[in-house]
Amino acid sequence: MIKVAINGYGTIGKRVADAVSAQKDMEIIGVSKTKPSAEALIAVQRGYPIYIADMSKKDAFAKAGIPVAGSVEDMLKKADIVVDGTPGGVGESNKALYEKAGVKAIWQGGEDHEVAGFSFNAHANYKDAIGRQFVRVVSCNTTGLCRVIKAVDDAFGVVKVRAVMVRRGADPHVVKKGPIDAVVLDPPTIPSHHGPDVNTVLPHIDIVTMAMIVPTTQMHMHAITIELKKEVSRDDVLAVMRSHNRIGLVQPKTAIKSTAELKEYVMDMGRPRSDLWENGIFEASVNMVGKELFFFQAIHQEADVVIENVDAIRAMMGEVRDPETSIRMTNEAMQFTAL
């Protein structure tokens, strides 16, 4: 069994913890929190040992009825690998801690590529991650882009990608962040960081991205144009999308045309936390004009990287060397079939 620690049991960390726990070849040996919270109480209910960075706060946890198993350093001693789920920019400061502990580590897309020197997507570069000590799983938006660009490039060849990212303003539980009544260019300059981030995984792709933030919490939306190397039919493209085990098609018969309706649909399906782990491509939007492919896709910012973290763990530990085998193991353990 691969022994996994979660440093930062928040939006991503708690989801990765549950995903890891569902796997037959992994176990959670501990999670970390900085202060008592509802999430910490849920971790206790789930049976995850809780570790803290500042042992002077142990009494505060005790008063909240949350047992503390030890320090983060204690947790790392028991782990084969740690998934860093701390807020963007914080994870980099933990690198020295992981190096000292001699533990493998995975960071999230909020950190720069340089923190690990390798950025990961299971379908694109799993084999290159085998045996690595440090890996960064790219962000939710970049994950969604990499999945579909890689699939289309393998099938037809890609000349260039142009994409507009309409990003949610905050996660649903966040009350101190906006905007409330504005569309914010983020950044106002072009390109946004998403294109260069795709190039950390798919360096040969010509891609330019633009991004804005809007007053919603339920997923990002991408408007994507891909110029292909040859003319293909819409049916050819849809066949590639349907065959991908982490790309889902939102079918016209559902009458879904918004992220809110899609989130509700996924919740009604019984997904944990109403998580959309796959790309949600709106089938009606898929269109070919000459060699240009157009479509919209919804990306659930809290969820799509979770399954990528599980595959990154397997790759780094080196016991499963075939990407499709790991992807299948992850999906099946989570009872996940793409839309």
UniProtKB/Swiss-Prot annotation:
The keyword Transit peptide does not apply. The active site is at C140 (nucleophile). The keyword NADP applies. InterPro entries: DapB_N, GlycerAld/Erythrose_P_DH, GlycerAld_3-P_DH_AS, GlycerAld_3-P_DH_cat, GlycerAld_3-P_DH_NAD(P)-bd, Glyceraldehyde-3-P_DH_2_arc, NAD(P)-bd_dom_sf. Its EC number is 1.2.1.59. SMART domains: Gp_dh_N (SM00846). D-glyceraldehyde 3-phosphate binds at S139, C140, N141, H194, G195. It is found in: Cytoplasm. CDD domains: GAPDH_II_C (cd18127), GAPDH_II_N (cd02278). It comes from the Archaea. One of its GO terms (biological process) is lysine biosynthetic process via diaminopimelate. Gene3D superfamilies: Dihydrodipicolinate Reductase, domain 2, NAD(P)-binding Rossmann-like Domain. It catalyses: D-glyceraldehyde 3-phosphate + phosphate + NADP(+) = (2R)-3-phospho-glyceroyl phosphate + NADPH + H(+); D-glyceraldehyde 3-phosphate + phosphate + NAD(+) = (2R)-3-phospho-glyceroyl phosphate + NADH + H(+). GO terms for molecular function: 4-hydroxy-tetrahydrodipicolinate reductase; glyceraldehyde-3-phosphate dehydrogenase (NAD+) (phosphorylating) activity; glyceraldehyde-3-phosphate dehydrogenase (NADP+) (phosphorylating) activity; NAD binding; NADP binding. One of its GO terms (cellular component) is cytoplasm. Pathway: Carbohydrate degradation; glycolysis; pyruvate from D-glyceraldehyde 3-phosphate: step 1/5. Its main location: cytoplasm. Keywords: Cytoplasm, Glycolysis, NAD, NADP, Oxidoreductase. Pfam families: DapB_N (PF01113), Gp_dh_C (PF02800). NAD(+) binds at T11, I12, G110, R168, Q301. NCBIfam families: GAPDH-II_archae, PRK04207.1. Homotetramer. Belongs to the glyceraldehyde-3-phosphate dehydrogenase family. This is Glyceraldehyde-3-phosphate dehydrogenase. The gene is gap.
